[in-house]
Amino acid sequence: MAPRKTVGILGGGQLGRMLTHPAALLGIPLLILDSGSFTPAKQTLLPPPSHSHPDGPFTSEPHIRKLASACDILTVEIEHVNADVLEAVEKEGLCEVQPSPKTIRLIQNKYDQKKYLAEKGVAVAPFEELPANPTEEDFKAIAGRLGLPLMLKAKTLAYDGRGNSPLKSTSSEDIQASLKFLGDRPLYAEGWAPFVKEVAVMVVRNKEGEVQSYDAVETIHRESILRVCLAPLRGERGVNQRARELAEKAVGHLEGAGIFGVEMFLMPDGELLLNEIAPRPHNSGHHTIEACLTSQFENHLRAILSLPLGSTALRVPSAAMVNILGASSTMDAIDKMADNALTVPGAAVHLYGKAESRKARKMGHITVTAESDAELNERLRTLLFAQPDAHADWIDLIAPPSPAPAHSHPKPLVGIIMGSDSDLPVMHPATKILEKFGVPYELTITSAHRTPERMVKYAKTAAGRGLRAIIAGAGGAAHLPGMVASETSLPVIGVPVKASVLDGVDSLYSIVQMPRGIPCATVGINNSTNAALLAIRILGTSVPALNKATEEYSKALEEEVLAKVDILEEEGWDKYIERLKK
């Protein structure tokens, strides 16, 4: 294998630190430019032989040029760099720069970025530039066009909410408060986006312009700082794919190679609006280290070095990332959160090696993976309640508590539906089987004939909400199981319900006689027990613990029958029959 090219990184923070891990595994020499000899990134990887990690500001022209002279490729872990120097370095042939300095410069100015994307047909919220030294009349005029409230944004040097200020009215007090918060920076205004979720997609782009996206994630912020990511994005059917397509479209219009973090808003009507792009690894992609076949950090290096891009697929059905934020100047809270995470199955701790803690500073993160959303939910609650600023109400919104008995689980794997409440006595045994196996489920009523729109919506959103199987009970015409099967990709198990006439045979025939291409499993009349057991066997193909539990259940049935055989032989059948009559 030919020696790898040497990569220089501008910035030695936590993103650079996490780039060093795959670099070491792939034998990629790295040189890291930042002030100090013990930055997070410099702690974890030695420089190539006869070199040392340069010590100096990553915005300094002399230091950038010195780094460029020792490297084959320069890249960034932060976009607030000197794009002019990077452009000059590349033009002079000192070294290659990825992503393109042109792209970095564009992204540095959020107004220019938004204007460019809008011109390329990428969906964004309405926005307008504010003049230099805007007057109150300027604010009133723009509010008249964009409406109130609106978001005032700094064009440059804005991250973690530090460049955003909501303007709720055009009163002098509100205007001056926003101007004071944003400081003496050029501004633009953006129409208010009353989103239902904030979404992010990581996209990797190689030098040939090929783009691949990771599954979209839901990003949950508190006080404008990212706190939790949930992967994959759950919601209406197709929303994950639409988010990926929007992100790929946006990154496809940029120049250069590397990983890009694309943030967007999911609106109440299902529309997706792009918010902004980061030309580097992103906090919303940290889960990819444990949760995906190739991490965002490895794929960034692969892309800029023209190595084959790695698969972006998830390794696990469910994953989350929790940021570890400083609570004070001491490390006590950080250590407590990390130690607590070590007790949580599927959790991996990443501490960034920062020497000083301060309130709201990103000191590390925890990735947690699970076989299901419900399992992830419980693990996530343990992690969130260990945070020093834990608030039960906020945590319950992100990771709802387990339900009371005989109530639907907030993160179900199996859906139980029926056409009428009169079917409940028949479907009730299925709930007991699922509870016995510890399978989270939901139960509701939806009729193929009386509530067809509700039925269609349920079927179309089931997979996107994390369900993996549906048990549908119906009597008479019994169209519910088949109709649901025609609207979802999930396995549907029909339970024929015995009605007042025909003893349920009509229901059985209706469910079992589905046309080719629309499979619908069918169990015996009124036998929701077998429907639940079949659903568990389906889940067991991907959840080993359920497969083992099914084997134990079958073994218990065998032992029960063998015990009866022994009693029958010991007592004789006459006494056995008499005991059965009792």
From Swiss-Prot:
Ranges of residues in domain ATP-grasp: 114-305
Bilayer-crossing regions: none
UniProt enzyme class: lyase
Record-listed ATP binding positions: 143-200
Pfam families, alphabetized: AIRC, ATP-grasp, PurK_C, RS_preATP-grasp-like
GO MF term set: ATP binding; metal ion binding; phosphoribosylaminoimidazole carboxylase activity
EC number: 4.1.1.21
Record pathway: Purine metabolism; IMP biosynthesis via de novo pathway; 5-amino-1-(5-phospho-D-ribosyl)imidazole-4-carboxylate from 5-amino-1-(5-phospho-D-ribosyl)imidazole (carboxylase route): step 1/1
SUPFAM superfamilies: Glutathione synthetase ATP-binding domain-like, N5-CAIR mutase (phosphoribosylaminoimidazole carboxylase, PurE), PreATP-grasp domain, Rudiment single hybrid motif
Keyword field: ATP-binding, Decarboxylase, Lyase, Nucleotide-binding, Purine biosynthesis
Keyword ATP-binding annotated: yes
Reactions the enzyme catalyzes: 5-amino-1-(5-phospho-D-ribosyl)imidazole-4-carboxylate + H(+) = 5-amino-1-(5-phospho-beta-D-ribosyl)imidazole + CO2
Domain of life of the organism encoding this protein: Eukaryota
A Gene Ontology biological process term: 'de novo' IMP biosynthetic process
Classification via InterPro entries: Ade2_fungi/plant, ATP-grasp, ATP-grasp_carboxylate-amine, ATP_grasp_subdomain_1, PreATP-grasp_dom_sf, PurE_ClassI, PurE_dom, PurK
Family indicated by similarity: In the C-terminal section; belongs to the AIR carboxylase family. Class I subfamily.
Protein's recorded name: Phosphoribosylaminoimidazole carboxylase
Lineage of the species this protein comes from: Eukaryota, Fungi, Dikarya, Basidiomycota, Agaricomycotina
Gene: ADE2
